[in-house]
A protein has these predicted regions:
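Long amphipathic alpha-helical scaffold segments
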Residues: 285-290
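Surface-exposed loop and adjacent secondary-structure segments within mature catalytic domains
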Residues: 183
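Non-cytosolic membrane-interface motifs at loop->transmembrane helix junctions
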Residues: 119-129, 155-158, 186-196, 253-264, ...
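Hydrophobic cores of alpha-helical transmembrane segments in multi-pass integral membrane proteins
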Residues: 14-46, 50, 54-114, 127-147, ...
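Short, Lys/Arg-rich, polar N-terminal cytosolic tail immediately upstream
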Residues: 1-9
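Internal maturation/activation junctions in enzymes
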Residues: 284, 317-318, 325
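Short, intrinsically disordered terminal tails adjacent to the first/last structured region
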Residues: 1-2, 462-467
Length: 467
């Protein structure tokens, strides 16, 4: 097996992403476990400028919300966009260099954050590279637009609509996020806009782009309704960017934007219902009986649905005062991120024989990997939601009783309630790291020692185009 430094086409470039994906997931697992350990055992483990809970939190945020997200957007664009446009990518050498520039700058941010922790923002970006990231991603979006305008098909397929939306909102979020502001409300407002556009929309659209591809080409099914697909796309496009403001309910944000966020979050039920009906009716027509790929797709969709149900339920006026400014919002972020990562695992399994021409045998190793991933993601999602509910209720009860839970006896009581699920999260991070290690071994085994099979060709016919 050889991977050329300068690939000649999209198919050759995709090999780079397939090989690198398990390594990035492993990096995420290592940093996540280290962060959880330094938080739980802060009084035992040594703390210094390079190993402390605060810096590890920022490193974890950057890997999760920036490095992996940008990597997935580039990965999907390289492979899916030419298939949905019916032609090869225009000016591919420039596209290749721009893609490497995006991933390279996000990786450089990680290194600069470790070397200059004072310039490392909470979500992981640094002030050194922000303007360069905006420029290089602007060039990437421009190249995507040029290719879309040169498409050979009369309309843009649903998976490409979501993919282009993810790229556009990623660029918008880069222009939004800056350092700390003097006015406290400005920090809340900017952080909320960043979380909504970058994490909620970015990861949701990556997931939905992959979902529409995998439920058609991945499991050989026929999309039930393009109309429902369009309803889902435009619904999530207009509603998701507003949904994070509600988690600052009762803070210094204006009431009107909190109320808009509450109403629009409830409205997520419409695109969610359209997408759910489309998914259920589509998968009933599948002809591929690969249980591992199908189970990962179905489970990731279930996580996505639960995450959006959390968004809707938290918008009820008698519930949001309890859940604002708690871990419940982190649970929602986690759901969007790991629904995309889970379906990415199934996508990589699907691509290995297509790109490398190596058959992947779905043995006990792949079954165990799938089980651990699904177990960790589901339990961690519920654990973070539970922490949010318990801490929010305790804060409100303590404030009403005149015994605040941010210090003293009230804080000790709150910590006794949430310490167990927080410790559970640390052990779940250990299992997640183990699952990612198994996934790395699975991919490596298939790429190196898998039986030779027929790889797909770069030519695209009308019959091969996905929905």
């Amino acid at each position: 097996m050889r991977i050329k430094i300068f690939p000649k086409n999209e198919q050759a470039f995709s090999k780079f992403f397939i090989v690198l994906s398990p390594l990035l997931f492993l990096l995420l697992g290592i940093v996540s476990l280290t962060k959880e350990a330094f938080f739980i055992f802060a009084g035992i483990l040594p703390q210094n400028n390079f190993l402390n809970s605060g810096l590890l939190e920022k490193l974890n945020n950057h890997i999760t919300y920036s490095l992996i997200l940008s990597f997935l957007i580039i990965f999907l664009t390289v492979y899916l966009l030419p298939k949905t446009l019916g032609r090869k990518l225009i000016i591919f050498p420039i596209f290749f260099l721009t893609s490497l520039g995006v991933i390279g700058l996000e990786s450089l941010d990680l290194l600069l954050g470790v070397l200059f922790p004072n310039n490392f923002l909470f979500f992981g970006n640094t002030s050194f590279t922000s303007i360069f990231k905006i420029l290089i991603f602007f060039a990437f979006v421009g190249l995507v637009i040029i290719n879309i305008l040169a498409k050979k098909e009369p309309s843009l397929f649903v998976s490409s609509q979501y993919l282009f939306g993810a790229s556009l909102f990623y660029l918008i979020s880069l222009m939004i996020y800056r350092g700390d502001f003097v006015v406290f409300s400005d920090n809340f407002f900017i952080n909320s806009m960043y979380v909504s556009t970058h994490i909620y929309v970015g990861y949701s659209f990556v997931f939905l782009s992959l979902l529409h591809f995998m439920i058609t080409k991945g499991i050989n099914a026929t999309l039930y309704s393009k109309t429902l697909g369009s309803i889902g796309f435009w619904g999530f496009l207009f509603l998701l960017p507003w949904t994070n403001f509600k988690f600052y309910f009762g803070s210094v944000l204006p009431n009107w934007i909190e109320n808009i966020s509450l109403y629009l979050s409830i409205s997520l039920s419409l695109p969610l219902l359209a997408t759910t009906v489309n998914f259920i009716r589509t998968v009933t027509t599948r002809s591929d009986e690969n249980n591992i790929i199908y189970s990962l797709i179905s489970f990731s969709f279930g996580i996505f649905v639960i995450t959006n149900v959390f968004q809707i339920v938290s918008s009820l006026t008698n519930i949001i005062p309890i859940l604002s400014l708690t871990n419940f919002e982190i649970a929602i972020r986690y759901g969007y991120v790991f629904s995309a990562i889970l379906i990415s695992v199934s996508f990589i399994y699907y691509l290995i024989p297509k790109i490398f021409g190596r058959e992947i045998k779905f043995s006990r190793l792949e079954s165990i990997t799938s089980f651990f991933l699904k177990f960790v993601v589901s339990v961690t999602l519920l654990s973070n939601a539970l922490i949010g509910v318990v801490s929010g209720y305790s804060w409100n009860a303590g404030a009403n009783a005149g015994n605040p839970t941010i210090y003293g006896e009230g804080y000790s009581l709150l910590w006794s309630l949430i310490r167990t699920p927080l410790t559970l999260n640390m052990f779940l991070s250990l299992i997640l790291l183990f699952a990612f290690l198994l996934f790395f071994v699975s991919v490596l085994k298939a790429v190196v020692n898998g039986d030779i099979t027929e790889a797909e060709t770069i030519e695209l016919t009308e019959e091969e185009l996905p929905v």
